[in-house]
C-alpha cells in the first residue's frame, strides 16, 4: 500500500508546491505529483524480481515433477510477487506514474493470500492420504479445503476492496483511510483463519504421531515419500509464522493511518524486510519441503471425476429429483383421500376396480349411477 501524501484532487489546489521532479520522476513530499514519502530504490525491486522469478520457475518444475495439479495455487503467489516487483522496477524509473505504482500495490498486497490457500489445500490432501477415515474432527478431507479456500476468498475480496480505495488517485484522504481500514480488517480476518488452521494442523500432526506409535499409520505410504512427513508439517508451521509476521507488520504500519511521521511509511526498507523477504522465504521453504515429496502416488490426490461421470451424476440427480417430486405428489394424493381411499387408489394403479357389493343390511343398488362402493374394511368409498 503506497504511502500517498497527496492525491490528484489535492494537487490541483495551492496545498502542494510545484517542485520539479528528479530525473527518475521522484517528487518530494509536499510537491505536486508526489506518491511516496521516500525515493524508491531501483536495485531492490530488481533483486526481488530475480528471486521471485527463480522460485516461480522451481515451483512450476516441481508441480510437473511431483504431478501436483493444485500447485498452480502457490505458483500464482510467486508469479504475482514477480509481476509486482517488475512493476516496482519500472516505477523506480518513473516515480510520478501511477500506471506502475497501482498494479504493484495490488499484486504485492494480495499475493500472499495464494500461499494460504495452497497450505489449506495441502491440509485436506494430508487428511485424505494418511487418515483411513478421510476425516478430521468429523469433517471430510475435501470439505476442509473447500471451507478454508472460500474463507480465504472472503479475506481476498475484503483486502481487494481496501486496496482499490487506497490506489484511487482521485480519492480524498478520508476515502484512502477508509480503504486502509478495510484492508486492515481483511488481513485481520486472514490471520484469524490462520490461527484456526494452525490448531487443526496441530491436531492432525498429533493424530498421525499417535497412529505411528500404535503402528496404524500406513508404513507403505510413509515410505513412498522422499522426506519424513514431519518435515512438511514444520515447513508449513514456518510458512504460517512468516505470513503472520507480514500481517503484524501491515497492521502496525497503518495503525496510525498515513501519518507523515510514521517511520514505516518514510522508509522503503520496511516493506522489503517485513513483507517481501518473509514471503520469499516462505515460498523458498515450500520449494525445499514441497508437499509433493510426502504426498506421493495417485491416492495422494482427490479422485478426479471425468466429464462423462459428471454428466451421469447430473442425470442421476435430475432423475432422483423428479422421482422425489412424484413421490411427494403421491403422498399428498393419499393424504387427501384419507385411509379409506388407499385400497381404491392401489386398485386403480393396478388397473382393477375395487370390490362392489350390496350395502350392509341387505340394501342393494339399482343402477350404475347409484352404485355404492366399499373397501375391504367395509367403509363406503365414493369413486
Curated annotation (Swiss-Prot):
UniProt key word Cell inner membrane: no
Induction: Expression is positively regulated by the aspercryptin cluser-specific transcription factor atnN.
Region described as Disordered: spans on this chain: 305-383
InterPro entries xref list: RTA1
Keywords: Glycoprotein, Lipid transport, Membrane, Transmembrane, Transmembrane helix, Transport
Residues annotated as glycosylated: 94
Main location: membrane
Record note on disruption phenotype: Eliminates more than 70% of aspercryptin production.
Biased composition (Basic residues): 307-316
Listed transmembrane segments: 46-66, 71-91, 104-124, 144-164, 182-202, 231-251, 269-289
Membrane topology recorded in Swiss-Prot or TrEMBL: Multi-pass membrane protein
Family that this chain belongs to: Belongs to the lipid-translocating exporter (LTE) (TC 9.A.26.1) family.
Chain's role: Probable lipid transporter; part of the gene cluster that mediates the biosynthesis of aspercryptins, linear lipopeptides built from six amino acids including 2 highly unusual and nonproteogenic amino acids, 2-amino-octanoic acid (2aoa) and 2-amino-dodecanol (2adol). The core structure of aspercryptins is as follows: Ser/Ala-Thr-Ile/Val-2aoa-Asn-2adol. The first step of aspercryptin biosynthesis is the generation of the fatty acid precursors, octanoic and dodecanoic acids, by the FAS subunits atnF and atnM.
Protein name: Probable lipid transporter atnI
Organism: Emericella nidulans (strain FGSC A4 / ATCC 38163 / CBS 112.46 / NRRL 194 / M139) (Aspergillus nidulans)
Gene coding for it: atnI
Amino acid at each position: 500500500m503506497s504511502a500517498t501524501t497527496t492525491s490528484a484532487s489535492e494537487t490541483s489546489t495551492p496545498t502542494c508546491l510545484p517542485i520539479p521532479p528528479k530525473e527518475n520522476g521522484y517528487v518530494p513530499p509536499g510537491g505536486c505529483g508526489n506518491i511516496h514519502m521516500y525515493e524508491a530504490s531501483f536495485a531492490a525491486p530488481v533483486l526481488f524480481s530475480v528471486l521471485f522469478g527463480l522460485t516461480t520457475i522451481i515451483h512450476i518444475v516441481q508441480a510437473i515433477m511431483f504431478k501436483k495439479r493444485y500447485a498452480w495455487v502457490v505458483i500464482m503467489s510467486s508469479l504475482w510477487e514477480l509481476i509486482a516487483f517488475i512493476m516496482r522496477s519500472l516505477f523506480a524509473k518513473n516515480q510520478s506514474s501511477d500506471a506502475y505504482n497501482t498494479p504493484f500495490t495490488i499484486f504485492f498486497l494480495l499475493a500472499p493470500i495464494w500461499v494460504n490457500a495452497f497450505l489449506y489445500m495441502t491440509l485436506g490432501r494430508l487428511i485424505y492420504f494418511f487418515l483411513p477415515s478421510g476425516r478430521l474432527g468429523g469433517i471430510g478431507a475435501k470439505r476442509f479445503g473447500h471451507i478454508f479456500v472460500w474463507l480465504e476468498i472472503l479475506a481476498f475480496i475484503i483486502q481487494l476492496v481496501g486496496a482499490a480505495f487506497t490506489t484511487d488517485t482521485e480519492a480524498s484522504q478520508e476515502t484512502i483511510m477508509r480503504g486502509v481500514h478495510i484492508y486492515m480488517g481483511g488481513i485481520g480476518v486472514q490471520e484469524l483463519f490462520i490461527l484456526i488452521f494452525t490448531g487443526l494442523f496441530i491436531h492432525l500432526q498429533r493424530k498421525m504421531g499417535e497412529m505411528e506409535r500404535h503402528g496404524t499409520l500406513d508404513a507403505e505410504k510413509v515410505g513412498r515419500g522422499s522426506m519424513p512427513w514431519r518435515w512438511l508439517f514444520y515447513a508449513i508451521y514456518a510458512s504460517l509464522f512468516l505470513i503472520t509476521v507480514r500481517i503484524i507488520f501491515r497492521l502496525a504500519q497503518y495503525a496510525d493511518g498515513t501519518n507523515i511521521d510514521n517511520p514505516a511509511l518514510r522508509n522503503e526498507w520496511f516493506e522489503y524486510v517485513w513483507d517481501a523477504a518473509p514471503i520469499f522465504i516462505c515460498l523458498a521453504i515450500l520449494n525445499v519441503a514441497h508437499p509433493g515429496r510426502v504426498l506421493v502416488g495417485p491416492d495422494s490426490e482427490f479422485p478426479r471425476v471425468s466429464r462423462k461421470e459428471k454428466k451421469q451424476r447430473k442425470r442421476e440427480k435430475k432423475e432422483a429429483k423428479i422421482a422425489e417430486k412424484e413421490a411427494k405428489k403421491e403422498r399428498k394424493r393419499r393424504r387427501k383421500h384419507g385411509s379409506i381411499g388407499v385400497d381404491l387408489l392401489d386398485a386403480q394403479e393396478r388397473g382393477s376396480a375395487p370390490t362392489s357389493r350390496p350395502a350392509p343390511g341387505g340394501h342393494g343398488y339399482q343402477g350404475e349411477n347409484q352404485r355404492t362402493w366399499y373397501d375391504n374394511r367395509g367403509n363406503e368409498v365414493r369413486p
